[in-house]
Amino acid sequence: MKFLVLALCIAAASAAVLTTEQADLVKKTWSTVKFNEVDILYAVFKAYPDIMAKFPQFAGKDLDSIKDSAAFATHATRIVSFLSEVISLAGSDANIPAIQNLAKELATSHKPRGVSKDQFTEFRTALFTYLKAHINFDGPTETAWTLALDTTYAMLFSAMDS
């Protein structure tokens, strides 16, 4: 379930409102954690077990016992790769339609599974917490990520409402 990926339309709309410098900050800081796929997904599931319950292959299982499994690593990689794709598009107005399309695809694939806006928001919160703990989250970096997430989530939620 690309549900998490979802959230990560994250930097998606960031292209529309981020300055080049802000987009570069998001990309630079993401590059320092994007290879920690398993740790990112683990942090999300640990903080919000209701999100984990949306994944049939993980629902009802002990998180610590599945963290090192191939299935967990594979799914974590899918989610982080989606986020990386969205983030790579940030910073250029020409990429806004592509980001909007990714947000729409995420909404279209997750809404029928019962994934709520609240759960997307939980994912965002867990991701933000993870980022703050693992990168240099100074004022400008926090502002850039907040703006990227705010804009992306506006696109995602708009797509969920349509």
UniProtKB/Swiss-Prot annotation:
Gene3D superfamilies: Globins (1.10.490.10). Residues 1-15 form the signal peptide. Heme b binds at H75, H110. Keywords: Heme, Iron, Metal-binding, Oxygen transport, Signal, Transport. It comes from the Eukaryota. InterPro entries: Erythrocruorin, Globin, Globin-like_sf, Globin/Proto, Mb-like_M. GO terms for molecular function: heme binding; metal ion binding; oxygen binding; oxygen carrier activity. Residues 17-161 form the Globin domain. Disulfide bonds: none annotated. One of its GO terms (cellular component) is hemoglobin complex. CDD domains: Mb-like (cd01040). PANTHER family: GLOBIN-LIKE PROTEIN. Homodimer. There are at least 12 different components in Midge globin. Belongs to the globin family. This is Globin CTT-VI. It comes from Chironomus thummi thummi. The lineage of its organism: Eukaryota, Metazoa, Ecdysozoa, Arthropoda, Hexapoda.
